[in-house]
């Protein structure tokens, strides 16, 4: 189906240890609009979508896992040299007590990932509109992370991710039009 290369989809650099920024980035790791939710949503929906757009959901769903890997790398690099005191001051004390430096799927507020973040209606057009909304929410979150970040190296990677969300949204919009045209061909008056 795909080939894994032992490199990130886009390079991730950070300027300095910054557990506070890592805490915010965790939103895209285990939050409702994050990369894990997107990957699982798209790969699940592909089983009830017409053949014409299955490949799109597969391609974007697997790319979301590459984005998840980038976010994990960012969080790791931003926290790898942090002391327990720095983690506590950044609001990651609860995380440290439960997971030490291990990543865990939760949002920036510490709420664990849940399947309720994922939607699959079974109506292909409805599901694609859900996917468009998911991509637009992710795009907005990446913009807000860029706005709050003071790390120019990290912002480069965040801009890459933001732009990929825009591309995904556009591709899902194209898929909606394909399915609408197909649906309209079947109407008999």
UniProtKB/Swiss-Prot annotation:
Similarity annotation: Belongs to the manganese catalase family.
Residues passing through the membrane, by range: none
Task performed by this protein: The cotJ operon proteins affect spore coat composition. They are either required for the normal formation of the inner layers of the coat or are themselves structural components of the coat.
Listed InterPro entries: Ferritin-like, Ferritin-like_SF, Mn_catalase, Mn_catalase_dom
Gene designation: cotJC
Superkingdom: Bacteria
Pfam family, one: Mn_catalase
Name used for this protein in its record: Protein CotJC
């Amino acid at each position: 189906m795909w080939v894994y290369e032992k490199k990130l989809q886009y390079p991730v650099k950070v300027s300095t240890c910054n557990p506070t920024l890592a805490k915010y980035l965790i939103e895209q790791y285990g939050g409702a609009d994050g990369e894990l939710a997107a990957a699982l949503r798209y790969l699940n929906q592909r089983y009830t979508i017409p053949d014409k757009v299955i490949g799109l959901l597969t391609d974007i769903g697997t790319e979301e896992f590459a984005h998840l890997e980038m976010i994990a790398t960012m969080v790791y690099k931003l926290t790898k040299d942090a002391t327990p005191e720095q983690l506590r001051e950044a609001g990651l004390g609860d995380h440290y007590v439960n997971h030490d430096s291990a990543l865990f799927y939760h949002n920036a507020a510490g709420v664990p990932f849940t399947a309720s973040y994922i939607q699959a209606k079974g109506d292909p057009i409805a599901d694609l509109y859900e996917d468009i909304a998911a991509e637009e929410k992710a795009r907005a979150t990446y913009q807000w992370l860029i706005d709050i970040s003071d790390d120019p190296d990290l912002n480069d990677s965040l801009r890459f991710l933001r732009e990929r969300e825009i591309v995904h949204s556009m591709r899902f919009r194209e898929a909606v039009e394909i399915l609408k045209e197909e649906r309209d061909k079947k109407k008999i008056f």
